[in-house]
Each structure stands twice: as C-alpha cells, then as structure tokens.
Regions:
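N-terminal entrance/gating region of PLP-dependent enzymes' catalytic architecture
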Residues: 1-36, 42
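Gly-rich Lys/Arg/Thr-decorated short loops/hinges at beta-loop-alpha junctions or inter-strand turns
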Residues: 12-24, 42-47, 78-81, 121-127
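Short, mixed-charge, low-aromatic patches
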Residues: 16-24, 49-52, 165, 206-212
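Short loop-beta-helix segment that forms the pyridoxal 5′-phosphate
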Residues: 22-26, 30, 43-63
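Hydrophobic/aromatic-rich, well-ordered segments within soluble, folded domains that form packed cores
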Residues: 31-46, 102-103, 198
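Short, hydrophobic/aromatic alpha-helical segments in well-folded domains
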Residues: 37-40, 50, 64, 97
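Conserved PLP-enzyme active-site core in the AAT-like
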Residues: 59-212
Length: 212
C-alpha cells in the first residue's frame, strides 16, 4: 500500500472511528469510501447508478441476468420468453456462473459467437464483453440499439481501466455494466475473489442487487 494512502486513510482515525448515530456497525469513513467508489464506477461506465459492489465479476454478470429475468415485460412473461444470449468471448468463469444461476431459474442460456446471433423476440437479454477475453475491443453501439428495439435488455462486461480510453457502454445505451474492480490495483486477498462492480440505469434502481 502506498505510504500516502496508509497515512491519510488507513491510519486516519476519521475514516475508521467516526461512527454514525443511526447505524453503529458502520463508520462514516466506510460510508464515504463507498460513496467515492460508487461515484468513480458511475463516472467510468457512464451509468447513473452503481451499487456498493458484489462478490466478483462473474457474480455481477449473473445478477444482471437475473435482474433482467425479473424485469421482463408482461408480454414476455405471458409468451414464456426465457432465452438469454451470452457471447462466447466472455470470460469462461463468467459463463459458468451464469449457467449455474440460470439452471435453477429455468432460464435457457445460449452461448455462441456474436456474429451468429440473430436477435429475435424470443430473447429477453444479452451479455457481451468489451474488451473481450482476448483483449479485442468492439463497439456494440449499433447492435445495442437494434437489440433494445426488439425488447431485449443489454448487459456489458467491461474493464474499468480501458473505460478511461474507450467509449463506455453507458453511452452505447447498455442497461447494465459489470466487471472487476481489481483493475484499480486491489490486492489479491489470498487468491480472490475481487470486488465486482455493477452499474445500471435509473429504471432498475428498485431491482438492482446489493446496496446502493
């Protein structure tokens, strides 16, 4: 840990002893740190809302799928729409967690090359990744627009540091942006997991997982 952070944050009593009168188990310093974290995530992803983190990136992606599942339109629920598309260049661990969570909800996960994806009304959502697991950067702005016109909800897994240089998914029109906060230089914590970030739009503020 850099000395300046150790002195001014980790060793600063104002960060870890200023207890709030209404919630004695959490310090004001932690609340401020979480607010700063959420503000950075919101700014980097170009999304209006970010939660206080989740377990890891794969968990965040699966939570996005479940949020979409519970946010289907009445017409989609009535029609029994249960397909969720995942691009095959998404991290394999993310795909595995999504499949596991989907199985017990009755969601049908389709994993394939995005080039083969024929977006139709039988899908309630889609997950793509940029940069993908191979480091390739693809701007999905046109695709996102087309998918949403067909009633699909769109999640994008992304890399925080890359968003300092490339167009953030929020500007594409994505509904959710997820990823790993380890890119900020967080320590390994005995091999992981790393904090997963989750950012979304105002429309999902009552559905988003975790703490706001």
């Amino acid at each position: 840990t850099p000395g300046v952070i150790t002195r001014n944050i980790l060793e600063n009593p104002g960060w870890y002893t200023s207890y709030t009168p209404y919630q004695a188990e959490i310090s004001q310093g932690r609340l401020e740190a979480l607010l700063n974290y959420q503000t950075v995530i919101s700014d980097m992803t170009a999304m209006p809302l970010a939660n206080a983190s989740l377990l890891d990136e794969a968990t965040a992606a699966s939570e996005a799928m479940l949020m979409f599942w519970h946010s289907r339109s009445r017409a989609q629920v009535k029609a029994g729409i249960k397909k969720f598309f995942v691009a095959n260049d998404v991290f394999p661990q993310t795909i595995d967690v999504i499949k596991t969570r989907a199985y017990y909800q009755g969601i049908e996960v389709i994993v394939d090359d995005i080039k083969n994806f024929s977006a139709g009304e039988e899908y309630f959502g889609v997950l793509v990744q940029c940069p993908n697991q191979y480091g390739r950067i693809i701007n999905y702005s046109e695709e996102v627009k087309a998918w949403k016109e067909k009633g699909m909800q769109v999640a994008v897994a992304s890399d925080l540091m890359s968003l300092a240089l490339i167009t953030p998914p929020g500007e594409w029109g994505a509904d959710v942006v997820v990823g790993s906060s380890q890119r900020f230089g967080l320590p390994m914590a005995f091999g992981g997991p790393h904090t997963g970030f989750f950012a979304t739009t105002d429309a999902y503020k009552r559905e988003m997982p975790g703490r706001i």
